[in-house]
């Protein structure tokens, strides 16, 4: 599994090749929680929320990982559950994941846009 992660990182993040490696890894190691978190992240990059939720649902013991909390935060953000998104992203940030800070900033922007649209009656 580690070798597959190293291969994935030879491709640009988010590229089809990068995503394909993570999807292959989760097929080869379906019980690996790390493989499922990586596959969920790849699914989120393609806006495949159902797949991402299924992969994240396979994580049972590694819910303290910042990557898991970040992925859950992004999933909840994309589903429009801003409060739950904030909860997960705050945990990821507190666990030291720098990307979570940027995602929290995105959450603030999304909430502001949603409030503005609601105010304008859209």
Identify the function of each model-found stretch.
Residues 18, 51-52, 85:
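Single-residue signature of alpha-solenoid repeat helices
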Residues 30, 63-64, 95-97:
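Short coil turns that delineate tetratricopeptide repeat
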Residues 21, 54-55, 88:
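Alpha-helical solenoid repeat scaffolds, predominantly canonical TPR units
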Residues 24-25, 58-59, 91-92:
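Canonical positions in the second alpha-helix
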Residues 2, 34, 67, 99-102:
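Start-of-helix register in tetratricopeptide repeats
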Residues 10-13, 45, 78-79, 106-114:
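Register position in tetratricopeptide repeats
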Residues 3-6, 38, 71, 103-106:
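Canonical tetratricopeptide repeat
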């Amino acid at each position: 599994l580690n070798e597959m992660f190293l291969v994935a990182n030879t491709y640009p993040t988010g590229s089809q090749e990068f995503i394909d490696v993570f999807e292959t890894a989760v097929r080869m190691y379906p019980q690996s929680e790390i493989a499922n978190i990586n596959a969920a992240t790849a699914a989120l990059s393609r806006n495949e929320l159902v797949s991402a939720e299924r992969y994240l649902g396979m994580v049972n013991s590694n819910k303290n990982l910042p990557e898991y909390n970040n992925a859950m935060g992004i999933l909840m953000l994309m589903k429009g559950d801003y409060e739950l998104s904030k909860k997960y992203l705050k945990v990821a940030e507190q666990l030291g994941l720098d990307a979570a800070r940027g995602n929290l900033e995105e959450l603030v922007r999304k909430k502001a846009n949603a409030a503005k649209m609601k105010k304008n009656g859209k």
